[in-house]
From Swiss-Prot:
Expression sites (tissue/organ): Ubiquitous.
Annotated Polar residues bias: 46-61, 82-92, 248-257, 263-272
Quaternary organization: Heterotrimeric transcription factor composed of three components, NF-YA, NF-YB and NF-YC. NF-YB and NF-YC must interact and dimerize for NF-YA association and DNA binding.
Name of the protein this chain belongs to: Nuclear transcription factor Y subunit A-1
Biased composition (Basic residues): 211-221
GO CC terms in record: CCAAT-binding factor complex
Any GO BP: microgametogenesis
A GO molecular-function annotation: DNA-binding transcription factor activity
Record field: compositional bias (Basic and acidic residues): 229-247
Its job: Stimulates the transcription of various genes by recognizing and binding to a CCAAT motif in promoters.
Transcription in keyword set: yes
Region (Disordered): 1-20, 34-106, 206-272
Gene transcribed to yield this protein: NFYA1
Organism: Arabidopsis thaliana
Length: 272
């Protein structure tokens, strides 16, 4: 005796709904592994779960009617759909059991899954609200406790940016000859150019010391500002000595003449 085809289709639909019932876990929605996973596409001819949950009687009668009309094609689709759903449900149960036993595995699985934005935040604009308290002391709420320093104490006295060196830095005076000044500037430019070209610069002599400068100022100079030679200095000293002697001689002769004149006047006045 053959069974009615409607009865067989009804049993298949009932088994399908039993497999399709969602599994309820105690974990929240953001810790569930299925969060953010795109649902798989269902083949044509498979009834939806929402209609069966909302009105089970009407959906069940509709499923039976559609299954009886489709025939062998719907039977094949139901078989493949049930096999895939059974495999996915068993895999989810196994994964849930392993995660409950091994917390490190659950954390690794959570990191492997792509981060999906929650649906309630999709489509909303996020704006930055300005801070109402502009001062560092929370709008004057902590003013009664006195002034408080913000920052690490050892770094409070340090400058926070580069400072330029003063232009009037104390340097030792440099004494050079007036005629050598242009040559000194020319050599300085040549040394600066050589430094830019990374050439070897030989050691230069130091500038004149202050004591030597004072000694040079005391030395006798000839015509043109040059230092006088020793012979010229001696000749100049001899000439100066002779001039001094000549001047002293003239002064002494003049004094003697004045004395003789005065004596003559006295003698003439005393005579009868």
């Amino acid at each position: 005796m053959q069974s009615k085809p409607g009865r067989e289709n009804e049993e298949e639909v009932n088994n399908h709904h039993a497999v399709q019932q969602p599994m309820m876990y105690a974990e929240p929605w953001w810790k569930n592994n299925s969060f953010g996973v795109v649902p798989q596409a269902r083949p044509s001819g498979i009834p939806s779960n929402s209609s069966s949950l909302d009105c089970p009687n009407g959906s069940e009668s509709n499923d039976v009617h559609s299954a009886s009309e489709d025939g062998a094609l719907n039977g094949e689709n139901d078989g493949t759909w049930k096999d895939s759903q059974a495999a996915t449900s068993s895999r989810s149960v196994d994964n849930h059991g392993m995660e409950g036993n091994d917390p490190a595995l659950s954390i690794r699985n959570m990191h492997d899954q792509p981060l999906v934005q929650p649906p309630e935040l999709v489509g909303h604009y996020i704006a930055c609200v300005p801070n109402p308290y502009q001062d560092p002391y929370y709008g004057g709420l902590m003013g009664a406790y006195g002034h408080q320093q913000l920052g690490f104490r050892p770094y409070l006295g340090m400058p926070r940016e580069r400072t330029a060196l003063p232009l009037d830095m104390a340097q030792e005076p440099v004494y050079v000859n007036a005629k050598q000044y242009e040559g000194i500037l020319r050599r300085r430019k040549a040394r600066a150019k050589a430094e830019l070209e990374r050439k070897v610069i030989r050691d230069r002599k130091p500038y004149l010391h202050e004591s030597r400068h004072k000694h040079a100022m005391r030395r006798a100079r000839a015509s043109g500002g040059r230092f006088a030679k020793k012979s010229e200095v001696e000749a100049g000293e001899d000439a100066g000595g002779r001039d001094r002697e000549r001047g002293s001689a003239t002064n002494s002769s003049g004094s003697e003449q004045v004395e003789t004149d005065s004596n003559e006047t006295l003698n003439s006045s005393g005579a009868p």
